[in-house]
Amino acid sequence: MENNKLTFRSLRACLFIGIISFSAAAFAQENKSLPDKVHHAEPIYNDLVRDLGARKGEKEFNVGADIKRMHSADESGYLVEYEFAPIDRLGLEAETDFAYSKSRMANVSSSNQLERLRLSSQYSFYVSKKHAATLAVGYTQIFDFVDGGTAFNPFFIAAKNWHSNWHALVYTGPELAYYYASSRMDMIWQINTSFHYTVPQTDHFIGIEVNQEITSDEIQTTLHPQIKLGLSSKLAIGMAVGLPVSGHEKDLSSFWRLIYQL
């Protein structure tokens, strides 16, 4: 009788250990199957299509506003975007841009219109945890409803972290704009560089973007000092100030972005 009880207890113990071992193995296999991903601080103003090294199933919803006070009018630009990763390392995004202008002149009316639709893709072709670096390429198709045209924007991204809290990122590529009525083609070369410091064990960061647009006539450079606050594991808000330092643009601006991880 005692032998039967001992055998039963042994079988029960073996079964328990087997279940725990199987669960641990399954969990380890699941973790092992996840592709490498390096966390990089993402710029607030010129944000990316999706996280670099995105993993399948990740989704995010953003709303933002760019507010500029000018001599003749107060201009506001609003954006709504949805981004997701259908497969590992590939991000897709759809963004709509709206513009509102409130005239400060008596004989000029205000306006409100849908400006652009942006459809983007981004693929991280190199992800290295060892070097804390990621390289990616992408493409954005822009449909301009105001000027009547479309723009083609291939781009390249390189990001690198130092000591886990210091982040640098470069986003660069041409934007070729084609206008239907005149059949004219214009090109702007974009170089956007960002540097950030992330607060340890939080989703907060502080940093700066240097946004440059280069044409045959000038180089427009705008600094965007910025801050991001992680309000929860899914919700964050980012704020930036636009400070033009070269080019024809002289007006200060402010920008905010609300980020929600779905």
Q: Model-predicted segments: where are they?
A:
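Cleavable N-terminal export/targeting peptides
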Residues: 1-41
